[in-house]
Amino acid sequence: MLKGSIPAIITPFSKGEVDFDSFAKLLKWQIKEGISGVTVCGTTGESPTLTHDEHMQLVEFAVKVSGRKIPVIAGTGSNSTKEAIEFTKHAYKSGADYGLVVTPYYNKPNQKGLVDHLSLIHISEPTRPY
């Protein structure tokens, strides 16, 4: 069960690239200050502006930097079911503890479409949804 302070961490950029050094400093500082977990690659973390490679690298990096001291919630949602499945599988393979799957916000499926979207993600990777 998740409890406590679990911030949605920002993704620092420098000269148009993800600034992994600044991200590591920020995450280490937040861990030192007592966070209970972290959410990476959510919309606060610039998920829609990251390339697929950056997204996947950032999840891997957050798991590594956290040193398994706190749970890592990886943003894995997408308007595309196929992409959300890919991100979710990668997050768990990388060691993330939870996947954060937002509802498709651009194409806005009806209730059946939403259930199908989430069900296909869960079937592909038995998730611990958050």
Regions found by a protein language model. Name each.
Residues 59-85, 90:
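Structural motif corresponding to the early beta-alpha repeats
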Residues 35-61, 76-81, 101-114:
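Glycine-rich, proline-tolerant flexible connector loops at the mouths of alpha/beta enzymes
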Residues 122-130:
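Single conserved hydrophobic/aromatic residue that forms the stacking wall/gate
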Residues 7-22, 72-82, 103-111:
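Active-site mouth loops of central-metabolism enzymes
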Residues 24-38, 85-98, 119-120:
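Alpha/beta enzyme core
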Residues 18-21, 25, 51-53:
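An N-terminal, well-structured beta->alpha segment
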Residues 1-16, 43-45, 58-71:
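N-terminal small/glycine-rich loop or linker at the start of catalytic domains
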Residues 4-6, 37, 71-73, 97-100:
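Structural preference for beta-strand elements that scaffold enzyme active sites
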